Design a protein with these regions (language model features):
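Amphipathic alpha-helical interface segments
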Residues: 105-137
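Intrinsically disordered, low-complexity regions enriched in serine, threonine, proline
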Residues: 122, 140-143, 345
Length: 755
């Protein structure tokens, strides 16, 4: 696959909306990320290119639409060899990586607030609907739309075979419009396709990976999401994603690379011969640590967000306290502190235009159009998993993952979704030191870290507790006669799947869900492995379980107090800025100093530490826009003492100055215009000249202190203005002062009339 750049230059304002509404002022918002940078979603680009290909085919040029863009509708219709040849990423602003890094460095400063960044690249457009009968605006038709500014250039990464280059280039040549209101002057674009420089980042992954240890039989890896990831669920398909990455997706990635680079299907069959292979699910993590599902025996206290109760020890609930099983979340325990980490999920809205392309939006189901939403795991999060197997299998998996860091996972990965980076963390052997991989004692706790498919003696899928217990005892090689007591805490789910090779769905079966726990007490001490897999389809990650000893022994002392439940600062990881192969991560979680639960989910207060603005940087653009806004506010504050006589006497002078400002670039030019206009012998003109000179002198005096005040208020240590910027800012302040004076004069006249 060759890499290219798709460049989109905006010839007019553009609004590409994701269907979300983020405040009460804007009815239709454009797509932008958490940092405030606008972008163009890849699915919109791919859809427009596909429409261009349809037009070209109608004009007589043959383009293999299904081969390049894939089949319309569900991507799981066909086999793996029918995937789209074209892969498009989101289109970001030119210089995005540098701007993103600058924003991350100054994260928390008022100048780099996401709203400031968004306002720097976008504008608001307000429209209404006019009644053809009355000629006036229809009631409740006023609406506001945010648009990306004309002149911006966006760049998208494209991967495709070189054989498809000419066809896609032809589509770009006729790609002229996109987005909302394209028949009303919005969305004019110029699209070009160019070759991309090969960075070599993927080939460098082998050198960056840790060495493969001798006799290694497991491999730990980290998945870093650069784009949202869709892991379709049984409940809602792509409309409701799972919040973890199934082991089957990692297994499929490895098999695909084996098939492409190591000898085809015969190499795949050889790799799968030994059933020792296990690809665990990848779960959310932070600071290099993997979090797992909260055990079913952990209960929360109603109206208490700081404490939890372990039902294994606290059977009697004090009067007035209500317990409920803790809701789904991922946890990691440190002593008695339970740290939780939630997976950030987002909804994105999409639509398919009708078969009649003259209609620009989804109208009804009968015309082939469709409006739908897709749920996905947000980009910027990290997931951790492990691959088990024989030495040969682990070596093969290591080679496949180390040779190429970038990978595309999940549903919809041909556009906008699924781009990830996989990094090998470590390898090891369970045979080197058995003490760390085993648990000894008479009391054991077996906890499912992944859903488990258990079959009973009749070869039927079962969710009977006794069948689960028998499966655990059999796997641990413990006789049922050794069992004294047991207690089972269960969660249930249903599982399915899709076989891409066959193009068929797997059967939906009931299963024990992750978080299920079995506590057993034996009449003898045993030594068992601390990790194991139960049930069926273990190769895909199902049935992963951990075995531990009890946290405390109530028989040898008082029951432990309720543990303290505290939340880690997971927002730092969830909002890491990751784009185009570069990552700017925040500090990992500090378990020694966790945030109190009251701070969970809250934004940090804006800092005003001094920063220095470099010429040509994002900070200079933001400071320029923010300073212009600040000048208007400053002028409105200073208007109260702008009059030395009655305000109404200034009215003609203020109006004339406002009208005459157009076309001037320096305030000295305005002064000459004032003298030439009012420099006559007439007493009225002398009075107007005096008023005009008062206003100009006031504007110059107040503006002289404005830069120092602005920098002090907003924590800016150095900001060098170009000479042309000084004149522009000074004229802007004069204009804002005149507008404020005009409003003040008008309000004064109205007040006098009312009196």
């Amino acid at each position: 696959m060759a890499k290219f750049h798709l460049n989109i230059k905006l010839l007019s304002d553009l609004c590409v909306s994701d269907g979300g509404v983020y405040n009460s002022i804007i009815d239709t918002d454009c797509c932008h990320d958490e940092a405030g940078f606008p972008f163009i979603p890849a699915k919109r680009i791919k859809g427009c290119l596909r429409e261009c290909a349809l037009e070209l085919n109608e004009w007589g040029k043959h383009i293999d639409i299904c081969g390049i863009f894939g089949e319309e509708g569900r991507s799981d219709k066909g086999a793996a060899d029918k995937r789209a040849a074209l892969r498009i990423g989101n289109a970001y602003l030119e210089g995005f990586e540098a701007m993103c890094e600058e924003a991350a460095i100054h994260h928390g400063h008022v100048l780099f607030h996401p709203q400031q960044i968004l306002n720097c690249f976008t504008s608001l457009r307000t429209q209404t609907s006019i009644s053809q009968e009355t000629g006036i605006a229809d009631p409740h038709s006023l609406r506001t739309m945010r648009v990306a500014n004309k002149g911006l250039v966006f760049t998208a990464d494209v991967e495709m075979p070189t054989s498809a280059f000419e066809s896609v280039k032809a589509c770009c040549a006729v790609f002229q419009q996109m987005g909302i209101a394209r028949t009303r002057g919005f969305g004019d674009v110029e699209v070009t396709l160019s070759a991309a420089e090969q960075s070599g980042a993927d080939s460098a992954n082998t050198a960056a990976s840790p060495g493969l240890l001798p006799h290694a039989d497991f491999l730990d890896y980290e998945i870093r999401l650069e784009e949202p990831l869709i892991c379709k669920s049984i409940a809602g398909g792509e409309a409701r994603t799972l919040d973890y990455i199934e082991g089957s997706k990692i297994l499929g990635l490895i098999l695909e690379r084996i098939r492409e680079n190591m000898g085809g299907q015969s190499a795949v069959n050889a790799f799968l011969e030994d059933e020792a292979l296990r690809c665990s699910n990848a779960y959310i993590g932070c600071g290099g640590e993997r979090f797992t599902e909260v055990p079913a025996y952990i209960y929360s206290i109603k109206n208490n967000k700081e404490d939890y109760v372990d039902q294994r020890y606290h059977r009697q609930v004090p009067e007035g306290i209500q317990l409920s099983q803790m809701k789904h979340c991922y946890v990691r325990k440190k002593g008695k502190d339970l740290f939780t980490l939630d997976v950030s999920v987002e909804e994105r809205y999409h639509h398919r235009r009708p078969d009649d392309k003259s209609i620009g939006r989804a109208v009804s189901k009968d015309d082939g159009s469709n409006f739908y939403q897709m749920s996905s795991i947000m980009a910027g999060q990290r997931f951790y998993g492990r691959i088990y197997g024989t030495e040969r299998q682990v070596e093969t998996a290591y080679t496949c993952l180390a040779e190429k860091e970038s990978a595309f996972l999940g549903y919809g990965r041909s556009a906008e979704y699924g781009k990830s980076r996989i990094r090998i963390i470590s390898t090891g052997s369970s045979k080197d030191d058995g003490t760390d991989n085993c648990v000894s004692g008479t009391e054991l706790v077996v906890r499912l870290n992944a859903p488990a498919i258990i079959y009973n003696e009749k070869a039927m899928c079962s969710v009977d507790r006794e069948d689960l217990l028998e499966e655990i005892l059999s796997s641990l090689r413990i006789s049922k006669s050794d069992l004294l007591e047991y207690e089972i805490y269960v969660n249930f789910t249903t599982l399915g799947g899709f076989n891409v090779t066959w193009g068929r769905r797997k059967p939906v079966v009931p299963a024990f869900d992750k978080g299920t726990a079995v506590c057993i007490k034996l009449n003898r001490s045993v030594t068992v492995p601390s990790e194991m897999f139960l049930g069926e389809r273990c190769m895909e990650g199902y049935g992963e379980a951990s075995v531990t000893g009890p946290d405390a022994d109530p028989q040898n002392g008082p029951a432990p107090d309720p543990g303290r439940m505290q939340y880690g600062d997971y927002l730092e990881c969830a909002t890491s800025l990751i784009r185009s192969g570069s990552i700017i991560s925040c500090d990992p979680i500090s378990y020694n100093h966790p945030l109190p639960v009251s701070d969970k989910g809250q934004h940090r207060e804006l800092q005003i530490d001094e920063i220095k603005i470099a010429s040509g940087s994002l900070g200079e653009k933001l400071a320029d826009r923010m300073f212009l806004t600040w000048l208007g506010a400053s002028a409105r504050e200073n208007v109260q003492d702008a009059f030395t006589a009655k305000p109404e006497k200034y009215r003609p002078t203020v109006s004339n100055l406002l009208t005459g400002l157009d076309g001037y670039t320096e305030i000295s030019q305005v002064e000459k215009m004032v003298v030439s206009r009012y420099g006559k012998k007439s007493s009225k003109k002398e009075e107007k000249l005096r008023y005009a000179q008062e206003i100009l002198d006031k504007a110059k005096d107040e503006f002289g202190e404005s830069k120092e005040r602005f920098c002090k208020e907003h924590g800016i240590a150095g900001w060098d203005w170009p000479s042309e910027a000084y004149d522009r800012y000074q004229l802007t302040y004069l204009r804002e002062l005149l507008v404020a004076m005009k409003l003040k004069i008008r309000s004064t006249i109205i007040e006098e009339q009312e009196e």
